[in-house]
């Protein structure tokens, strides 16, 4: 597959509010790949890093298929507040729509791959984060990490993913080493040297591989990185699903996953901390940053899609908001048909 045309950006917007300009290689570079639904997530992810790492110099990169004036203005205010630089890369998603995707795994999952390819010619390393990740502690240890010939540094996925992934990918070596791609610190020198973008698309073009995939980009990245990655401790990708609140019915359950050592909280699942029904202590790590950000006067997101209504009404009933819960359940059933 000719992938070079996939990284042709419609526009690149630089929001540089630093009093002293630095070359990108003199800073720690962090990127996100988003569609419109994850705009606020990426913004608060940036704000959370800055709030917890005020002595470090960063360059932030957002690859997005949708940008509007309000979002750009709010990001500009964020950059001004912290005297940092945020770069926006407006990508045309149409060429990517031929790649495997679903309602749960949209085309934007491939933006991380494109960021690795694009920045491999410009930088030595890059931290990629999913836009549902919040930082709650210092990145000093991660910034100090040095690579040899590893492709990057990753965090092993939750236990429930290990044996299933090994079976699906037909390799027992993944049982205990299958990682979650939401946090990836990439050695871009090795990415370029090993021509990993080409290898990714070679695997994606192999029918025998495609039929094994459940999480398209994550599975392929695991196939590529097996025996070639540094393993980071769990604190760099503490995975928590907010639906656990009504499933476990325990307001302290989240503390099994999020604790004093946690650096990155990864809010997986349908309900995100920016949804208006995510009224839990576990979401406060996001909401506390939100409330001191340029987004603070903008209401949290309402349910729009059917699967959001399905989960929202369960949360509302658990929160004893019975009337709202019943109306939301009715709305869900009408949408379900």
What are these regions, as identified by a protein language model?
Residues 29-32, 49, 59-61:
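Hydrophobic targeting segments
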Residues 152-173, 279-282, 295:
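A short, conserved beta-to-alpha structural element at the edge of catalytic cores
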């Amino acid at each position: 597959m000719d992938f070079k045309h996939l990284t042709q950006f419609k526009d690149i917007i630089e929001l540089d509010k630093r009093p002293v300009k630095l070359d990108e290689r003199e800073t720690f570079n962090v990127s996100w790949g988003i569609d419109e639904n994850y705009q606020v997530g990426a913004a608060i992810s940036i704000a959370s890093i800055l709030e917890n790492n005020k002595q470090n110099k960063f360059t932030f990169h957002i690859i997005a298929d949708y940008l509007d004036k309000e979002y750009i203005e709010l990001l500009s205010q964020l950059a001004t507040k912290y005297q940092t630089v945020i770069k926006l890369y407006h990508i045309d998603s149409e060429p990517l729509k031929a790649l495997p995707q679903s309602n749960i795994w949209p085309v934007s999952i491939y933006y991380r791959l494109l960021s690795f390819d694009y920045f491999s010619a410009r930088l030595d390393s890059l931290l990629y984060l999913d836009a549902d990740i919040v930082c709650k502690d210092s990145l000093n240890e991660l910034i100090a990490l040095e690579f040899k010939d590893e492709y990057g540094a990753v965090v092993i996925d939750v236990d429930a993913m290990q044996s299933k992934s090994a079976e699906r990918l037909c390799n027992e070596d993944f049982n205990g080493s299958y990682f979650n791609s939401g946090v990836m610190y990439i050695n871009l020198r090795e990415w370029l040297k090993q021509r990993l973008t080409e290898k990714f698309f070679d695997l994606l073009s192999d029918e025998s591989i495609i039929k094994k995939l459940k999480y398209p980009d994550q599975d392929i990245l695991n196939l590529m990185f097996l025996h070639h990655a540094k393993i980071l401790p769990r604190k760099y990708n503490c995975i928590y699903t907010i639906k656990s609140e009504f499933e476990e019915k325990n307001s302290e359950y989240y503390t099994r996953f999020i604790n004093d050592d946690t650096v990155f909280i990864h809010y997986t699942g349908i309900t995100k901390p920016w949804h208006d029904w995510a009224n839990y202590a576990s979401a406060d790590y996001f909401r506390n940053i939100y409330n001191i950000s340029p987004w603070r006067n903008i209401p949290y997101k309402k349910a729009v899609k059917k699967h959001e209504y399905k989960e929202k009404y369960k949360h509302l009933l658990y929160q004893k908001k019975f009337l709202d819960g019943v109306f939301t359940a009715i709305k869900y059933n009408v949408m379900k048909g």
